[in-house]
Amino acid sequence: MTRDVQKPVSTKDFLKDVFICSLGAYGGPEAHYGVFTDQLIRKKQYLTEEDLIELIALTQLLPGPSSTQTLVAIGYKMGGPKLALLTMLVWSLPVIVVMILLSFLSELLGVFHLREDGLRYIGPMAVGFIILAAYRIGTKVVKDSFTLGLLIFGAVGTFFIRASWIYPAVLFTGGLLAVARSKEKDIWHRVKLDPPYKYLFFFGFFALGGLLFSAFFDHVLIDLFESFYRYGYLVIGGGQVVIPLMYTELVEIQNYMSSQDFLTGFGLVQGLPGPMFSFSAYAGAMAAKG
């Protein structure tokens, strides 16, 4: 990294740049990376593009919102846990608040025909952001025939196999092939890991506690907490992957909302900047209303 926790940046300036990213981040995580590159690397040089690519690869292996995790990791590198938390709030809180408010204004949106007519041009714009981000990242990582082969392998695998497990499987396979091909010595013994196991304890406590409370107590808020927490720790691939799962549970199984209300919220989040997972705020508010 170009900067680290020992040499923190100005909290105010960094959070201002994060807020600028949140205002221009349309189109899901793939497009978000292009925004991060422009604002945090090209303009402010908080880190290098190679550093960003490494963080993206790491977060792709983890469940949950990948672009949010990437940005929070950058915040942690710049200023430690406090700045990481503030980064997450500045990045996600504005659009989450907007989505919650819109869940209570769905009838008004229908009157003004914003369900479909006002949002039909957002999709093509988002595709443009995604193509630009893919090109910029591709020029940095595809350097020879081997990396080109990995790119084709990943693209073909994820295109034909539509399952959440394919993403970490492709990344693990590519990583193993790269390590096996590498001529570096003792590559497995260079990094000493000392993970904070207390965080794993809290994660397991809430995961198991949510399942138990949901099984023994029939309350909509408990069920919603368990469902959304489970989405966060099981779903790999970002907001686009979790949407079908949410639709099945919230609309078809639990009947917390209508299909039209669900699709309206999905259309709205496509037209707003910020993380795709903010759709969970809309869906949760709609479900809580009953």
Predicted ranges, named:
Residues M1-L62, A73-G290:
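Multi-pass membrane proteins that catalyze or facilitate reactions on polyprenyl-/lipid-phosphate substrates
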